[in-house]
Structures are given as C-alpha cells and as structure tokens.
C-alpha cells in the first residue's frame, strides 16, 4: 500500500491499524483496518475524508474574495454536514439492511484550514465480489432485491 497520510493517527480509535486500501470516491478513501486481541483479528472499514480535499481547494475559495476566516467558516460548514451524517448513521445503527456505523474521529489540522474525518464502519464484501464468487440462484437474487428495498425504507 502506498503511503497513507491517515497512518499518522494510529492507533485509530485506540487500537486499530490501517492495513489495506479498498478504494476511493468523490468523498475520500476507504481502507481495511484491523485490531488484534487475544489472538483474534477483528476487521472494520475506515472511510477517510479530508476537508478541504487539498490546498488548491482553499486557494480557489479564497480567490473568490473570501478572507481566511470566511474560508475557515465555509469549510467548517462542510464538516458540520458530516457531523449531521454521523448523527443520522448512529440512529440507523442496528438496522440489518444498512452498513453499521461504529465510531468516528474528527481531527482539526494545526496551522492550516482543514480537517480529517475518519469513520469506522462495518466491513462488508462488495456485491460485485459476492456475485463473482458464486452464481446466485433466482431465490437469492430476489432476497437481495427485497433487502435493498427494505434498506431504502429508512
């Protein structure tokens, strides 16, 4: 795995370590994290988001005429959106049809505008991997579709 800037915060959540990168999207990267206890290895997913995404994003916002203080407040608003998401995810915890939120860390950068948001979640096998490993029968496909619809009810 290439160098991961989030390793500087290890151990995460007191005892978790980043082991592999799963992927990335518009809102950040996703990693496998592990914790070892009494000979047992526990795994979770870590969604890592940096706000702003890079220094160019700060420059872009400030080039629109915002002061450093105003830019900080702008990005703080984006962070607040994620905090609201944590609250919602926490309320949905325990629903068998939705990925389980476990914990989060919100780390404000020193001496610059920025935050790192780390979200520990249940580690699941991607649907495409499940279907590639075995041919699903019609009954299994129907159950999967029903489960997805139940998740959307929330």
Model-inferred region functions:
Residues 36-83:
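ATP-binding glycine-rich loop module of kinase domains
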Residues 122-132:
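Structural motif in protein kinase domains
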């Amino acid at each position: 795995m290439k160098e991961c800037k989030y390793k500087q915060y290890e151990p995460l959540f007191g005892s978790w370590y980043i082991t592999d990168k799963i992927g990335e999207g518009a809102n950040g990267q996703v990693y496998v994290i592990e914790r070892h206890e009494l000979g047992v290895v526990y795994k979770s997913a870590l969604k890592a988001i940096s706000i702003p995404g890079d220094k160019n994003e700060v420059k872009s916002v400030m080039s629109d005429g915002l002061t450093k203080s105003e830019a900080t407040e702008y990005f703080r608003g984006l962070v607040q959106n994620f905090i609201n998401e944590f609250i919602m995810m926490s309320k949905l915890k325990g629903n068998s049809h939705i990925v389980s939120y476990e914990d989060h860390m919100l780390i404000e950068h020193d001496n610059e505008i920025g935050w790192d948001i780390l979200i520990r979640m249940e580690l699941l096998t991607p649907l495409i991997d499940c279907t590639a490993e075995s041919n699903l029968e019609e009954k299994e496909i129907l159950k999967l579709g029903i489960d997805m619809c139940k998740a959307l009810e929330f």
